[in-house]
A protein has these predicted regions:
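Extracellular, repeat-based ectodomains that mediate carbohydrate processing or recognition
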Residues: 1-340
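Residue-level hotspots within well-ordered secondary structure
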Residues: 340-467
Length: 467
């Protein structure tokens, strides 16, 4: 807490290109109003440097941030975006940028055009350092974006993305506050959807059966045209899905996390799910992340369950963040989700045998390349190739068997070519019961992608042989 302020809140965490974490947050009710401050850590979050002021004004709120990981001219730049109330011109969106890893910030700049009710901005960098900010216009219930091609110095005309139907607050039968906090993500990679921009929001279906769901709009032409789909299209229960947050990973895959109630027949308990698109936002696959549903009313703050979801992704992992109340208290939860390569089972029985079906989904940037599904009895130290790609498998007997007998009756479709989205299906089939002496052995499998030298290796997935 900075001297002279009463409390702080709304933290946004961004990682610089060198891995330095920066927290950008609000400081409330000090002299001059509310401030936007940035804090850096040079020891992986153990200690934090003194705060750096990015802005000080009467009523700042809801700050979000992003870093430019593209190969564009502003590589490494950080941008913070927030809304400001009571400006005399409605509620507006402001940004400030840093070109030195959060040590200093530019003078804040208003970027929205209309004197409207602009609120809750989100920010993302796309290909070639294109900077995108989205927000909700709560006066007209519109989703809006704007973008800058020069590192935030100048901005274009506001772009309309879509209308949305305001979700009731609270949702009927619930107690927690709803708010129009949406998300933007941009493809900063060099893949087939480079430059694409995605906006995710929740909206209300006002006719029976009434419920909230998540939509995502995509543009592949710099915002000139947008097409949107329902993200949670596989849900046939008419349950509520709210509070989306989106990120594009290094393989060009779009990942969106959100709260979801489809597993509760009463449409009440909350789970966290992740939806992924490897085709530029045209279709999504959905995965449950949290272990159990939770009752927001049983926690200490039934009204607030956290306005923000969060999600980030590396080349190998997706990391959703959310408020979780399964303990009876509100906690910040995170999971490491391996959705590039996984098995539908974690065990196979010696008594009956069986099949472990593998899903490969490594993203459109690797689409059309060759792949091997390989196995090993251990993951350490693994194999590191000359170009730095690390395969987390050892060169042992199982490794050699999976190579020699690829595409056999036992190792099915374990060598081939990925589809355009970077996907394939493979399996390990025991062909019936196997020796009980093998029970207790862990088998590890990983996918190696070639172009033709090793280009990428997935995290391993484990299948344990049991009696």
């Amino acid at each position: 807490l900075e001297p002279g302020f009463s409390f702080s809140g709304d933290p946004s965490v961004v990682f610089c290109v060198d891995g330095t974490p920066v927290i950008i947050c609000l400081q409330y009710y000090g002299a001059g109003g509310s401030g936007i401050y940035a804090y850096r850590s040079l020891d992986q979050g153990i200690t934090w440097q003194s705060g750096v002021q990015a802005d000080l004004n009467g009523a700042n709120d809801k700050v979000q941030s992003a870093c430019d990981f593209s190969n564009g001219p502003h590589h490494g730049q950080i941008c913070a975006a927030w809304d400001r109330f009571f400006t005399g011109a409605g509620d507006n969106v402001y940004i400030s940028t840093s070109d030195d890893g959060g040590q200093t910030f530019s003078t804040s700049k208003r970027i929205d055009d209309a004197n409207a009710n602009a609120i809750a901005p989100d920010v993302a960098y796309g290909a070639n350092s294109e900077l995108w900010v989205m927000w909700a216009d709560r006066g007209r219930f519109d989703v809006m974006v704007d973008h800058s091609s020069d590192g935030g110095a100048t901005w274009g005309t506001d772009i309309f993305v879509s209308n949305f139907n305001n979700v009731p607050s609270p949702i009927p039968g619930s107690f927690f506050r709803m708010f129009d906090i949406f998300s933007v993500a941009a493809d900063w990679t060099n893949g087939p959807f480079a430059g694409s921009v995605y906006v995710a929001w929740h909206t209300w279906k006002g006719s029976a059966p009434r419920h909230a769901n998540i939509r995502c709009a995509a543009t592949h032409d710099g915002g000139a045209t947008w097409s949107s789909v329902v993200v949670n299209a596989s849900d046939t229960t008419f349950a509520d899905q709210v509070f989306p947050h989106a990120v594009v990973d290094a393989k060009g895959t779009l990942n969106i996390d959100f709260y979801d109630r489809r597993l509760d027949p009463n449409n009440y308990l909350l789970w966290t799910w992740v939806a992924r698109s490897s085709d530029g936002g045209a279709t999504f696959k959905e995965y449950r992340v949290s272990d159990a549903g939770w009752d927001h009313a049983a926690t200490e703050s039934a009204w607030f369950i956290g306005d923000y979801m969060g999600i980030d992704a590396s080349a190998h992992e997706v990391r959703p963040f959310w408020t979780d109340g399964t303990s009876g208290s509100q906690d910040v939860a995170c999971d490491v989700v391996n959705l590039d390569f996984f098995s539908d089972v974690s065990t196979l029985s010696a008594a009956t045998g069986g099949v472990a079906a593998f899903t490969i989904d490594v993203g459109p940037n690797l689409g059309g390349l060759d792949y091997w599904v390989l196995g090993s009895l251990a993951t350490s130290p693994g194999l590191t190739f000359g170009n730095g790609v690390h395969l987390p498998l050892n060169w042992d007997l199982l490794f050699q068997i999976t190579m020699q007998f690829a595409n056999s009756a036992t190792f099915v479709n374990t060598h081939g070519t990925l589809d355009a989205a970077g996907g394939a299906l493979a399996s390990f089939d025991t062909g019936g019961p196997f020796s009980p002496a093998l029970a207790g052995i862990d088998l590890y499998f990983s996918t190696l992608v070639l172009q033709p030298s090793p280009a990428f290796a997935t995290n391993p997935t484990k299948v344990t042989l049991v009696p």
